[in-house]
């Protein structure tokens, strides 16, 4: 287990308890209007900003290294999506992850298209030192991240497909379960695997 891991056994929540917690989170967002900056792909920038505004948050879309460092300090959390990359992201993404860690701010990683080109691989390797509080992706993406971060051979053994195919998964959510748990234990946060039936784990 990595030095980053802080996972402890968490209590099992009932569906009713989860609904109550989610409702409370929604109320808190509306009451506090938190800033949640994003370094996101150009395809979804408008959608992400509108979604954040719709739930009561405040949005900011950035892409330069000094912008990432600034909003990491100002915002409540940062969302990073690797769907469409610019050359400057080679500096922006690691710098923002470091700034979040230094400021004690959580950040979310969406490793869209992992395996397409060398830059995505370099970025995901780089942020291993300052891992996200939440990792979300499809099954193939989560398996690929676990393998890239060296979190054991179990993830590769469970893989049922050929890895990510662009933004699509070739693996089932069930096949990504051990990879998701390994990633969550490493980061000390949560991992969400999207699919026909989503999987969310804190590694417990």
Predicted features and spans:
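Small-residue (G/A/S/T)-rich helix-start motifs and N-terminal tracts that mark the onset
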Residues: 2-95, 99-101, 178-204
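Short, basic, glycine/proline-bearing loop/turn elements
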Residues: 34, 51-54, 78-83, 106-112, ...
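Glycine/small-residue-rich loop that forms an oxyanion/phosphate-binding "nest" at active or ligand-binding sites
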Residues: 81, 89-138
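Conserved phosphate/ATP/ADP-binding segment of small-molecule kinases
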Residues: 118-203
């Amino acid at each position: 287990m990595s030095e980053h891991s802080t996972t402890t056994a968490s209590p099992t929540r009932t569906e009713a308890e989860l609904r109550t917690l989610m409702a409370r989170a929604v109320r808190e967002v509306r009451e506090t209007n938190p800033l949640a900056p994003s370094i996101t792909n150009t395809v979804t920038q408008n959608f992400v900003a509108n979604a954040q505004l719709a739930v009561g948050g405040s949005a900011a879309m950035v892409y330069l290294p000094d912008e990432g460092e600034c909003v990491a300090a100002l915002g409540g959390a940062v969302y990073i999506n690797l769907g469409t990359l610019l050359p400057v992201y080679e500096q922006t993404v690691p710098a923002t992850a470091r700034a979040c860690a230094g400021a004690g701010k959580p950040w979310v990683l969406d490793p869209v298209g992992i395996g397409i080109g060398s830059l995505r691989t370099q970025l995901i390797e780089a942020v291993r030192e300052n891992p996200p509080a939440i990792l979300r992706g499809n099954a193939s993406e989560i398996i690929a991240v676990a393998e890239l971060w060296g979190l054991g051979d179990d993830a590769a053994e469970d893989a049922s497909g050929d890895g990510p195919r662009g933004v699509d998964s070739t693996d089932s959510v069930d096949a990504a379960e051990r990879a998701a748990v390994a990633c969550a234990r490493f980061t000390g946060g949560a991992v969400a695997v999207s699919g026909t039936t989503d999987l969310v784990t804190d590694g417990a």
